[in-house]
């Protein structure tokens, strides 16, 4: 549809840059045909039996490393999507010749190559984040329940994954031979698209998930999983990232509770935004505990809650306390990242649909106590990918030129 609308402008396309949401896994057979649907990033099913099996048949190397980091390995084994398939769908596991991410599958369909971007490797994967490559040690693949030869070839951020095949050109309308460029996951390219590629700036993305990320010059870790570190949108850069899975989804949830009072979601947002501006900070004694799903590091068994309700509270009080609760979670994430990295963030950039809320932005600025800005274009994920796509084919001399374009 997009290529049809472009018409003759298609000839001006210089490259195609791929980004996608992360931590989605799908097995493929030897003919590169999917064996099942995706296990997506929101799927938190665990496989504790994998931990017991690894301990039972552990090699000496596995025992040695486990003696140093037993807890980390056990956690990875239990949360690995490969292990879930191995123990719950053994016939699929046996037939799997490859496992791919969403961007890897798109690359396969567009170029015919079993390749994927280094920057897309997020989640419970046998990926060495510090060195930006697959692990070199066989026992790590035992932990995750997958083989090295089942993983796609990694391509650095900003390099060429392949070119559009004849078949893909016919199916999509894209020019045959068009370069397809490796980028990174959606949150990492958001940081780049927002122009934040130093530790001095943090990027908050207010979408279904609420996340806060800081691009680092070296990997920063937290052994308690209070935040994650993923490969950044640029080689030799890393994104320290804190998130709550249910971010501004909570605002949608609140609308569902009052949907009968409004003709549309937009009407609800408009009325609540106006009314919430007259609610004092603290939402008249209400507090939202925003962990409606688990958080591995802070609250692995969390349940969301609204604390302080009385018969005098109104819906705008509840609405404001939701905005405050989400912003307080972002402050909590920023604090732990700054403590681990020993670096102070000077400015916060907010993007995503939630950044369009004036009252939400002011609450965020107040709680984080830093200069806080939003961009004219709140959807900067595609912009970050386009910057890398342009640089790869010479449209931009460097990333800075792309950011300023």
Task: Spell out what each predicted region is.
Residues 47, 54-72, 76-115, 124-146, ...:
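Active-site core segments that coordinate phosphate-bearing ligands/cofactors
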Residues 7-79:
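Active-site phosphate-binding/coordination module
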Residues 1-37, 95, 166-170, 174-179, ...:
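N-terminal glycine/serine-rich phosphate-binding loop of ATP-dependent small-molecule kinases
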Residues 32-34, 120, 234-236:
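Short glycine-enriched loop/turn motifs at secondary-structure junctions
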């Amino acid at each position: 549809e997009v290529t049809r609308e472009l018409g003759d402008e298609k000839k001006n396309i210089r490259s195609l840059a791929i980004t996608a949401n992360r931590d989605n896994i799908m097995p493929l057979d030897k003919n590169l045909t999917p064996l099942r649907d995706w296990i997506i990033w929101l799927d938190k099913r665990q496989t504790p039996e994998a931990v017991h099996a690894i301990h039972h048949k552990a090699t000496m190397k596995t025992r040695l490393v486990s003696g140093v980091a037993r807890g980390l390995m056990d956690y990875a084994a239990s949360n690995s999507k490969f292990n879930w398939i191995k123990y719950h769908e053994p016939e699929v596991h046996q037939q799997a010749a490859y496992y791919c991410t969403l961007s890897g599958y798109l690359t396969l369909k567009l170029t015919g190559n079993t390749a994927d971007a280094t920057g897309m490797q997020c989640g419970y994967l046998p990926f060495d984040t510090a060195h930006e490559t697959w692990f070199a040690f066989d026992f790590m693949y035992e932990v995750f329940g997958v083989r090295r030869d089942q993983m796609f070839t990694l391509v650095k951020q900003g390099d060429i994954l392949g070119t559009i095949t004849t078949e893909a050109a016919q199916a999509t309308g894209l020019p045959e031979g068009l370069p397809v460029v490796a980028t990174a996951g959606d949150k990492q390219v958001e940081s780049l698209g927002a122009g934040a590629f130093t530790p001095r700036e943090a990027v908050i993305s207010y979408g279904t998930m609420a996340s806060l990320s800081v691009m680092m010059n070296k990997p920063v870790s937290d052994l308690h999983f209070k935040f994650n570190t993923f490969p950044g949108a640029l080689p030799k850069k890393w994104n320290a990232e804190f998130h709550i899975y249910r971010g501004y989804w909570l605002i949608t949830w609140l609308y569902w509770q009052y949907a009968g009072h409004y003709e549309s979601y937009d009407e609800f947002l408009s009325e609540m935004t106006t009314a919430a501006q007259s609610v004092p900070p603290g939402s008249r004694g209400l507090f939202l505990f925003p962990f409606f799903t688990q958080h591995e590091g802070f609250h692995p068994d969390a349940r969301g809650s609204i604390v302080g309700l009385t018969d005098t509270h109104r819906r705008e009080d509840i609405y404001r306390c939701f905005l405050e609760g989400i912003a307080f979670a972002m402050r909590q994430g920023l604090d732990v990242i700054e403590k681990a990295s020993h670096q102070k963030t000077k400015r916060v950039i907010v993007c995503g649909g939630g950044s369009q809320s004036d009252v939400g932005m002011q609450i965020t600025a107040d709680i984080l106590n830093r200069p806080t800005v939003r961009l004219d274009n709140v959807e900067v994920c595609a912009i970050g990918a386009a910057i890398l796509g342009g640089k790869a084919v010479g449209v931009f001399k460097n990333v800075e030129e792309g950011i300023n374009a």
